[in-house]
Structure formats: C-alpha cells, structure tokens
C-alpha cells in the first residue's frame, strides 16, 4: 500500500513539474543612466518550454516596472505599456531597444555601467498559473544598443 501511495505521489509531482513552464533568460541587460534620468529599459531574450505570457515585472531599482512596446505610426515612435507579451513555446522572444522591453520608471538612483539590477519577471501560463523568474541584469553604457556578442 505504501509503495502504491508513494508511486502515485511521485507521478503527481512529476505531472505538476511538467505543467510548469520553464522560462530561459539570455543576456539580460539594462541601459545605464545619467544622474537626472528617471527611467531606463531592460532588455533580454526570453524562451519558454510552453506557451506563456510575460505579464509583469518588479525591481528594487525602480518604483514602477512595466512591460512596454515601441511602435511607429506616421513616422512617430510611440511607447506604451502592454498587459502581456506572448512567449510561444520553443521560440525566443527578444526584448530589445526599439521593440518590446521592460521599462524601469522612477529610478531609485542612477544606474551605472558594471552594476547589476535585480528584476523579477512574472509569467502566466495557459492554465492561469503564475510563475516568477529572478534575473540579474548587467548595466551597460548609456549608448549601448544591443548584444555584446554582436561583432562587425
């Protein structure tokens, strides 16, 4: 009886683990700021093992943290907060300058190159379950435009 109960418990735990999406974060970074600057963006690659949505974020570096998108309309770039960013299973979604990103608003202090900014990313799966991924994003120079791996 005990062996059957244990086997059922292990099978149940395996099912729950399989149902939880695994999100991989690659090259997280934040653009550095000047002393009077009150906001910055965080950028990274996100890949999930199952369909999820990035629905929020938080960081001790900023009082407000939002998921944003950039779009161009009639030659004018516009930025706005969005309720969620879909991550299709197995596909990498890039958060990058000029596109989707995590916006850090009302910064607690300037972000200096070489520092690390902790960011908590919140995801929701198709089943409604929330999960959080903790990230440490490296602060890059104010003029940085993207991947440090990019070479000419």
Task: Identify the residue ranges that each predicted region occupies.
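Compact, glycine-rich, soluble single-domain proteins
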Residues: 22-152
